[in-house]
C-alpha cells in the first residue's frame, strides 16, 4: 500500500482518542500543540515508551517474527524524530539522503524515538553508504549511550531515506538493502520520505516498510494482501504513474511489490517533545524547526509551512531552486534560506523589464527581433502536424529523468528554440542588403499564409495581431538608407553604365535645361550630354555637403529646442520606449529563447553600452 492513500493525513490536528479509517488501515492522529490537555490521559502516560526496555525479553528469546512474516504491523514515530527526518530530506533537495532510526521493540510494534543523519553519497535516484557511514553509525550510537550514563537503552531499529518527487515505495536496491539488514539485525524497519510532495501538499509524505524473508512461502492476511495489491500499480494507471518517475525508477515501480509490505504509522509525543514544541511556538524563535508546525484552526490537516509563506511563494519552485545545485548543506543553509532567495528572485523580472523600457533599443537588435517574430508565426503554421505526431509518439522510454533536466538534454525531434547562435552569426554575415530582402519576403509570406492553420495553443489571434502591428514600425530607417539603398544604387549604377549614352541620360531634364539656356533652335552638340551629366553630379555633391553643414550647425547651435530634440533622439522618445516595451512583452509571450538571452542585464550592457 502506498503512502499516498495510507498516510496522507498522518499529522492531522485531532484528538488522540479519535481514529479515522482509510481504505485498509487506521492512523491515529495527535494534536502536537495540546498534548497536555488531552482528556483522560495523564502527562506521564505520554512517556510510557521511554520507560520500556529496548526490547521485550520474551520476544527477544522467542523471536516470533521469524515464524510469522507479518508479525510487525505498526510503527510509532516520535514527533521530533518525524521533524528531523522531514528537515533532513528537505535540505537534500533532489538528492537522496539517508539516516538511521533509533528506538525500541514492543509487542507487534516498532517504536522510532530518534533519528540521526549519515554521511553518505547520494544522487537523484539512489543513495550509497560507504565505510565512513558505517563507522559513523557505530560511534554515534556508542557515544549516545555513554552520554546518557546507561539510562538510554534505545538501539538501532532501522533506516530511512528520501525519494524526492516520486513517492514512498521500495525500489529493487531498497528491497535488497532492507532484506540484508533484516537478515542479520532483525527487527529492522525501512522508512521512506518524499520532501517534494510534502512541500507541495503541506502534509508529510511518509511510508514504513518491511520485506518478506527470501524464499518464504508467505500467505499474508487480507490486510497485508490488500497492501501488497496497492503497492502494485493498477494496469489502467500504470503508464500515468510511471511518467512522473525518473527513467531509472520506471522499471522498478511495482516490480517488487510482492517482496515487502507496509506498516501502519502512528505519531506520538512525550513531555520532552512538549518542551521543544513549546519553544517552537515562541514567535521570537528563529530555529530551523519552527516553520514545520503551524497552529492551524482546521481539523483536517497540519500544514508543513506557515500559511503566509504559502500565499507568497510556490513551494515547488523552491525544490527546483535546490535541484539547480545552489544549495550546500555545509554552508549552514536551510530550506527557509532558499525560500528567501526565491522571494528576491521573484522580483527580478519586473526590475529587468523596467530597465528595458527606459532604454532605447539598437536598430540592429530590433530588426533581428522582428525577423524572428515573423519566423515564429510561420513556424506555428508549418509545424502543427509535426507537433501532433510528436505528442502521440512519445512513449515511456522518452520520459526525462531529473538528471536529464539539469543537463538540458531534450528529447529527440522536439524543437526547443527557433534558431541557434550559429544561425544568428550566419544571418549577420550574409550582408545587410540580403537581410532586408529576406525581411520583405517574410512579410509577404506572413500576409499570404492562412491564419486558420495557426495552432491556438502556440499562437493565438491576439498574438498574431501584435505581430501584424509590428509591420507598421519602421525599424530600419538608418539601416536601409545607408546599406540597402546604397546596395541598390550601386547595382543600378552598373546597369546604367552599360546602357547607350542616349538611354543613360534623362532626356526630358537635359532638353529642358538646353531650352532654358535659349538654344531651342540650335542643334545639340554630341558632347553636351556628358557636360550636362557632370554638372548634375557637381550639384548633387554640393547639395549633400550643404545638408551636412546645416545638420551639424543645428546640433551645435545655441537653440535649446534643437538640443532637447537631439537628446530626445539620443535617449529615445516616449514612442520609442513604448515600442521597446511592446517588443519585450511580445517576445516574452512568444517565448523566444534567443530573446530571453538578450534581455538580461549583462546583454543590456553589451547591446546598449
UniProtKB/Swiss-Prot annotation:
One Pfam family here: JAB
Major site of localization recorded for this protein: cytoplasm
Gene Ontology CC terms, in alphabetical order: COP9 signalosome; cytoplasm
InterPro entries found in the cross-reference section: JAMM/MPN+_dom (IPR000555), JAMM_MPN+_peptidase_M67A (IPR050242), MPN (IPR037518)
Biased composition (Acidic residues): 392-404, 420-431, 445-456
UniProt keyword annotations, A-Z: Cytoplasm, Hydrolase, Metal-binding, Metalloprotease, Nucleus, Protease, Signalosome, Zinc
GO molecular function: deNEDDylase activity; metal ion binding; metallopeptidase activity
Species in which this protein is naturally found: Candida albicans (strain SC5314 / ATCC MYA-2876) (Yeast)
Positions that bind Zn(2+): 161, 163, 174
Entry text on domains: The JAMM motif is essential for the protease activity of the CSN complex resulting in deneddylation of cullins. It constitutes the catalytic center of the complex.
Compositional bias segments (type: Polar residues): 214-224
Subunit note: Component of the COP9 signalosome (CSN) complex.
Protein name stated in the entry: COP9 signalosome complex subunit 5
Task of the protein: Catalytic Component of the COP9 signalosome (CSN) complex that acts as an regulator of the ubiquitin (Ubl) conjugation pathway by mediating the deneddylation of the cullin subunit of SCF-type E3 ubiquitin-protein ligase complexes.
Subcellular locations according to the entry: Cytoplasm; Nucleus
Sequence motif JAMM motif, residues: 161-174
UniProt entry tagged with the keyword Lipid biosynthesis: no
Amino acid at each position: 500500500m502506498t503512502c499516498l492513500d495510507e498516510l496522507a493525513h498522518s499529522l492531522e490536528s485531532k484528538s488522540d482518542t479519535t481514529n479515522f479509517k482509510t481504505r485498509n488501515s487506521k492512523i491515529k492522529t495527535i494534536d502536537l500543540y495540546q498534548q497536555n490537555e488531552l482528556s483522560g490521559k495523564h502527562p506521564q502516560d505520554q512517556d510510557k515508551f521511554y520507560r520500556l526496555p529496548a526490547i521485550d525479553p520474551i520476544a527477544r528469546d522467542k523471536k516470533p517474527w521469524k515464524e510469522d512474516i507479518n508479525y510487525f504491523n505498526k510503527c510509532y514515530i516520535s514527533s521530533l524524530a518525524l521533524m528531523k527526518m522531514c528537515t533532513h530530506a528537505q535540505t537534500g533537495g533532489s538528492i537522496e539522503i539517508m539516516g538511521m532510526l533509533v528506538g525500541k521493540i514492543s509487542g507487534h510494534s516498532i517504536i522510532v524515538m530518534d533519528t540521526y543523519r549519515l554521511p553518505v553519497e547520494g544522487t537523484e535516484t539512489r543513495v550509497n553508504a560507504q565505510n565512513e557511514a558505517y563507522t559513523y553509525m557505530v560511534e554515534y550510537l556508542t557515544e549516545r549511550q555513554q552520554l546518557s550514563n546507561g539510562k538510554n537503552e534505545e538501539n538501532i531499529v532501522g533506516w530511512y531515506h528520501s525519494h524526492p518527487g516520486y513517492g514512498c515505495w521500495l525500489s529493487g536496491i531498497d528491497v535488497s538493502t532492507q532484506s540484508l539488514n533484516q537478515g542479520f539485525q532483525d527487527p529492522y524497519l525501512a522508512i521512506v520520505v518524499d520532501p517534494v510532495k510534502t512541500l507541495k501538499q503541506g502534509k508529510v509524505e511518509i511510508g514504513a516498510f518491511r520485506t518478506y524473508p527470501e524464499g518464504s512461502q508467505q500467505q499474508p492476511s487480507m490486510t497485508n494482501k490488500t497492501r501488497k495489491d496497492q503497492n502494485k500499480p493498477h494496469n489502467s494507471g500504470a503508464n500515468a504513474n510511471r511518467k512522473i518517475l525518473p527513467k531509472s525508477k520506471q522499471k522498478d515501480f511495482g516490480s517488487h511489490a510482492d517482496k515487502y509490505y507496509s506498516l501502519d504509522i502512528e505519531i506520538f509525543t512525550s513531555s520532552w517533545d512538549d518542551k521543544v514544541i513549546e519553544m517552537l511556538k515562541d514567535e521570537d524563535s528563529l530555529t530551523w524547526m519552527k516553520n514545520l508546525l503551524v497552529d492551524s484552526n482546521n481539523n483536517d490537516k497540519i500544514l508543513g509551512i506557515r500559511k503566509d509563506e504559502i500565499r507568497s511563494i510556490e513551494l515547488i519552485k523552491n525544490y527546483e531552486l535546490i535541484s539547480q545545485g545552489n544549495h550546500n548543506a555545509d554552508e549552514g543553509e536551510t530550506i527557509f534560506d532558499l525560500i528567501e532567495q526565491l522571494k528576491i528572485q521573484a522580483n527580478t523580472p519586473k526590475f529587468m523589464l523596467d530597465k528595458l523600457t527606459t532604454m532605447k533599443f539598437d536598430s540592429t537588435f530590433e530588426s533581428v527581433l522582428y525577423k524572428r517574430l515573423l519566423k515564429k508565426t510561420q513556424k506555428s503554421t508549418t509545424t502543427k502536424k509535426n507537433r501532433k505526431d510528436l505528442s502521440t509518439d512519445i512513449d515511456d522510454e522518452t520520459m526525462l529523468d531529473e538528471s536529464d533536466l539539469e543537463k538540458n538534454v531534450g528529447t529527440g525531434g522536439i524543437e526547443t528554440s527557433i534558431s541557434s547562435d550559429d544561425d544568428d552569426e550566419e544571418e549577420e554575415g550574409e550582408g545587410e542588403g540580403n537581410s532586408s530582402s529576406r525581411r520583405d519576403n517574410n512579410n509577404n509570406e506572413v500576409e499570404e499564409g492562412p491564419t486558420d492553420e495557426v495552432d491556438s495553443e502556440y499562437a493565438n489571434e491576439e498574438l498574431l495581431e501584435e505581430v501584424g502591428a509590428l509591420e507598421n514600425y519602421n525599424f530600419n530607417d538608418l539601416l536601409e538608407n545607408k546599406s540597402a539603398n546604397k546596395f541598390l544604387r550601386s547595382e543600378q549604377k552598373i546597369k546604367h553604365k552599360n546602357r547607350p549614352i542616349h538611354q543613360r541620360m534623362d532626356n526630358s531634364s537635359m532638353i529642358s535645361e538646353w531650352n532654358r539656356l535659349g538654344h531651342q533652335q540650335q542643334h545639340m552638340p554630341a558632347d553636351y550630354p556628358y557636360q550636362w551629366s557632370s554638372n548634375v553630379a557637381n550639384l548633387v555633391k554640393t547639395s549633400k555637403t550643404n545638408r551636412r553643414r546645416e545638420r551639424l550647425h543645428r546640433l551645435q547651435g545655441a537653440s535649446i529646442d534643437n538640443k532637447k530634440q537631439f537628446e530626445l533622439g539620443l535617449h529615445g522618445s516616449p514612442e520609442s520606449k513604448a515600442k521597446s516595451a511592446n517588443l519585450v512583452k511580445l517576445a516574452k509571450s512568444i517565448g523566444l529563447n534567443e530573446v530571453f538571452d538578450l534581455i538580461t542585464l549583462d546583454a543590456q550592457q553589451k547591446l546598449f553600452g
